[in-house]
Amino acid sequence: SGIKNRLFENHQLIQFLLDSASVFKSKKINFPWLENFLSFTPFKSIIDKNKVKNLFISKDSKSYEINMPFIDLLTAPGGKRNRQLIYGSKVKYFGEADGWAFVQNTYDSYVGYVPQNTIVPETKKTHIVSAPLTHVFLEPNIKSRNIEILPLAAKVSRQMVENGFMETELGWISVAQLKRKTELPKDPVEVSKLLQNTPYLWGGNTSLGIDCSGLIQISMLLCGFAC
């Protein structure tokens, strides 16, 4: 009954439900109270309660990853930005409705919505972007056409190296701006200096815009610490 008097942000409530479901499922406890619980929470305005119930008792989530340079993690479909997810970030995928995927970031456990077409099944990544931003080129040549740009801490897969460039699933990236996942920096403070003078952006996680949480998270993440 004490839960009824608590105020939740949408993402906090979703997280609470997911965490509770995990505990109950592990103990094989039924939870017929779910519909009653949803009837007095703001969560019912975000997702149909039957979909939530299916989510709550569904089979285990699937492992996916972000396939865009970066994408906003939203508190509701078309809603406010809560955080940003970077290319190669691992997420737990719970389901889709009306073109929106409901996911949980495996690094910080934030949950929210991203467009369905911005996630793909998880793949093995070998390297991580170690520069504030890096270009992806069509060919292993700086005069080649750049076809994409990736932010700090984006993860890619090595295919081959030529002329100082690494071929990845996206194209060619300068080797100087990549590090093996097994050879990451050790000092988050030094990493944070790469983002000096970055403009402030609420929920931002890149050198195009970042907030205090994002700065700490990216600095720790590049050193191999989930945060």
Task: Kindly give the residue locations of the regions a language model identified.
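Boundary regions of SH3-family modules and the immediately adjacent low-complexity/disordered segments
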Residues: 2-61, 83, 87-92, 97-98, ...
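Short, contiguous, helix-prone interaction/anchoring segments in small proteins
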Residues: 64-66, 80
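SH3/SH3-like (including bacterial SH3b) beta-barrel domains
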Residues: 75-87, 140-152
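Hydrophobic beta-strand signal
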Residues: 92, 154-157
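A structural feature that tracks compact, well-ordered secondary-structure segments
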Residues: 148, 158-159
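Catalytic cores of peptidoglycan-degrading enzymes
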Residues: 185-227
